[in-house]
Structures are given as C-alpha cells and as structure tokens.
Amino acid sequence: MYYNILYMELEKTICFTGHRNSHLPWRGYEIGEQFNNFRIRLRNAIEENIKKGYVYFLSGMAIGTDMIFSELVLDLRKKYDIKLICVLPFKNPDNIWAGHLKERFRNILENADDVIITSETYSKSSFMIRNKYMVNNSNKLIACFGNFPGGTLNTINYAKSLGKEIEFVSLY
C-alpha cells in the first residue's frame, strides 16, 4: 500500500486542511448537535465537489478534521467512483497516539486507495512539506478554519499564493 502512487489528474483533485482536536468547538468529542451539523456540512461539500467532477481527495491524516474528512470520503466512495489518497508527513506518525486513535488511523489507511509519504523521518518541517505537497498536487482546497494560527492557516495562505480555489466549510 505504501508508495503505490496513484496517478491523479490535477484538475480532478481536492486537498483538505483543517484543525486538530484542540481547536475544534467539540474538542475532539465527536458527539452532539454541533459536531453532527459540521459533519453534514463537510459531507455536503465533498459530495457537491464530486458532482462537479472531482475524483481524487487528498488527506493529511492528522487527528481531528482530517480523519473526519477521510472517513466521509470513504463512506461516499460506496456511492461514487472516487479515490482517497492519504498523504503522511513521515512514516508511522501514529506511533505516539493512544490505542483508539491508532486503530482509527490504521483503518483509514487500510481502506485508502493510496498512501503517499512525503518525508522518511520526522522533522520540524515534515508537516509543512506534506501540506505543500497536497496543495501543489491539487486544483482546489477544502478548508475548515476557525481563525487560529498554525498549519491550517499556513496551508490556506500557501494555496492562496498559488491561486488555488479554496472552499471554506464552517466549524460552527
């Protein structure tokens, strides 16, 4: 599964960026009306883009909205001929995670159509390299952003600098 780089057509490829659990209104507890409404909004955004001809969906696989995005793409794959490509910042990023997150992460990877690893080992720049790879290899960015500084904002700004189309999905 690793390094089996699937051919992607740029004009049919979307990448995703969003916050990790600590910046989410539901703080990682995926229950309640606020979370369910967010999940519906994100699913609708993905499905609308599928109807516009997007086929390839890149996920950075961070804990939080990336995993939600990935699971929604996998669910929609039952209905549409689409592909989930997981783009990891380095090998085995789940080694430091708790059991249930590790299991969820590995389940997504096992069901993904492809897995790309952008750096062999962890470094301070691993996540930035991964995010730039995703933006460089996509036509559009879907962003779930709550006005916090960090990787999500950096990815949005990088996509803007390249003139990429950006679609925002509200966290609230």
Model features per residue range: what roles?
Residues 1-7:
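N-terminal amphipathic/basic-hydrophobic helices that include classical n-h-c signal peptides
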Residues 7-172:
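Acidic/glycine-enriched connector segments
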